[in-house]
Amino acid sequence: MAAKATSEKGFKTITDNRRARHEYHVIETYEAGIALSGTEVKSLRAGKANLQDAFARVENGEMMLYNLHISPYEQGNRFNHEPKRTRRLLMHKQEILRLYGKVREKGLALIPLKVYFNPRGKVKVQLALAQGKKSYDKRHDIAARDAKRDMDRAMRERQKM
């Protein structure tokens, strides 16, 4: 019925891109609004969205979001939306130009991390300026996570004694 989770501040997370943190080094995060149709908002309220292959790009001075899959609204009829259409992100012009310069210069990517409702009920996208990880970076992160897990487990066992 509603979105997945509600925090104490009133933010309701619709969908997370957990794979993005595994595939990319997140450098900075930004918040952007998103231009949606009525059936898209209703479908998002039901939690029917997927960020798996989504990315953002600056095109003709506007920030666009590609491959965000929002399932068609079940009660919608002939006015229903296309699931993977390109959607416009709402950001200040200066912010868009700054991001465009960073993406062009350094070979960075704009990846959506999550889609959520803010306390006022508006749909927002958290974008990350990110750089792709190499396979050895991924292995290093996995090894560090395993070592931390083992250390925590040992500390818990020691406290039980």
From Swiss-Prot:
GO terms for biological process: trans-translation. It comes from the Bacteria. Transmembrane segments: none annotated. Required for rescue of stalled ribosomes mediated by trans-translation. Binds to transfer-messenger RNA (tmRNA), required for stable association of tmRNA with ribosomes. tmRNA and SmpB together mimic tRNA shape, replacing the anticodon stem-loop with SmpB. tmRNA is encoded by the ssrA gene; the 2 termini fold to resemble tRNA(Ala) and it encodes a 'tag peptide', a short internal open reading frame. During trans-translation Ala-aminoacylated tmRNA acts like a tRNA, entering the A-site of stalled ribosomes, displacing the stalled mRNA. GO terms for cellular component: cytosol. Keywords: Cytoplasm, RNA-binding. It comes from Desulforamulus reducens (strain ATCC BAA-1160 / DSM 100696 / MI-1). Belongs to the SmpB family. This is SsrA-binding protein. GO terms for molecular function: RNA binding. It is found in: Cytoplasm.
